[in-house]
Amino acid sequence: MSDSQTLVVKLGTSVLTGGSRRLNRAHIVELVRQCAQLHAAGHRIVIVTSGAIAAGREHLGYPELPATIASKQLLAAVGQSRLIQLWEQLFSIYGIHVGQMLLTRADMEDRERFLNARDTLRALLDNNIVPVINENDAVATAEIKVGDNDNLSALAAILAGADKLLLLTDQKGLYTADPRSNPQAELIKDVYGIDDALRAIAGDSVSGLGTGGMSTKLQAADVACRAGIDTIIAAGSKPGVIGDVMEGISVGTLFHAQATPLENRKRWIFGAPPAGEITVDEGATAAILERGSSLLPKGIKSVTGNFSRGEVIRICNLEGRDIAHGVSRYNSDALRRIAGHHSQEIDAILGYEYGSVAVHRDDMITR
């Protein structure tokens, strides 16, 4: 083994259930064994786990429930305690304690809460405790959900200061096409940069059960790689896959980390789930992408969602493509009022101003 490294392992529903309605405990035992072996060798392990709803449904005897958010949250509330109990029981076989962290998007959007979550996670790791992270599905609404555990795992990797992020799924990795419908599909072993062509390939692929398909795994890889974290998509069923990844053995698809990673604040901006969205005109798009300029109110065409000053927002071009993320200098209502106006008009329109730009270039990351 090499010197101590920090690894985040994301386990999707398809991996934990094997495609069935219930948790595949035998397989989870094997995954824990692999993690415990690495832990004993001095590595730091973080688990991002799905499966709370599946565990809740199993524990309640597969009840007939209406297909509502409330039903899913009921199952998550029951299942989350069962899930963490399972992780605790299995890791305790190896004398390892686990610590549960349940997160929502609000913990990522707010810089102070983000830093608090980081400090908690790193304190667990510093004390040889394995953090087990999941989205707080029992209380999360659509407005406060990260949305899927792929993107949550990328945020966890940033919080942990991880060296590697391993996304385990029911596929061997990212293919040139969906291997289940195209026999000519080939495994892509190495990726050195994520572009629109690769996003198009991922958009046509499906990774099985759960909320995250290949497109969300690509989003997670993009966030992690730009933060300097190697990311691997691999099959959770492959024997010894977790140890192989830590040994540097080629498995699945390896997304190579960016050579010059983003500094810490910009990692937060890039990784935080956007609280809202603004659409900008062609001139603003060119200024942002080609000249690295700040976004002026004049270039804003529309504002979507409700957000506060200081929150991270998504910036899209007229075709709806996500071109940048940035910290808004104004709340959503104020941006709607000053959209399309020159900067010198801000004070007259609002009665105050926080500067001449809507999003400053120092607080912006292009996609």
Curated annotation (Swiss-Prot):
Residues at which substrate binds: 50, 137, 149
EC number(s) on file: 2.7.2.11
Gene3D superfamilies to which the protein is assigned, alphabetical: Acetylglutamate kinase-like, PUA domain
An example Gene Ontology CC term for this record: cytosol
InterPro entries: AceGlu_kinase-like_sf (IPR036393), Asp/Glu/Uridylate_kinase (IPR001048), G5K_ProB (IPR041739), Glu/AcGlu_kinase (IPR001057), Glu_5kinase (IPR011529), Glu_5kinase/COase_Synthase (IPR005715), Glutamate_5-kinase_CS (IPR019797), PUA (IPR002478)
Subcellular location: Cytoplasm
Record carries keyword Protease: no
Reactions accelerated catalytically: L-glutamate + ATP = L-glutamyl 5-phosphate + ADP
Catalytic EC class: transferase
Keywords recorded for this protein, A-Z: Amino-acid biosynthesis, ATP-binding, Cytoplasm, Kinase, Nucleotide-binding, Proline biosynthesis, Transferase
One annotated GO molecular function: ATP binding
CDD domains on file: AAK_G5K_ProB, PUA_G5K
PROSITE patterns tied to this protein: GLUTAMATE_5_KINASE (PS00902), PUA (PS50890)
Pfam family, one: AA_kinase
GO biological process: L-proline biosynthetic process
Binding residue positions for ATP: 10, 169-170, 211-217
Predominant place of localization: cytoplasm
Matching PANTHER family: GLUTAMATE 5-KINASE (PTHR43654), ISOPENTENYL PHOSPHATE KINASE (PTHR43654:SF1)
Reported function: Catalyzes the transfer of a phosphate group to glutamate to form L-glutamate 5-phosphate.
Record's protein name: Glutamate 5-kinase
Organism: Escherichia fergusonii (strain ATCC 35469 / DSM 13698 / CCUG 18766 / IAM 14443 / JCM 21226 / LMG 7866 / NBRC 102419 / NCTC 12128 / CDC 0568-73)
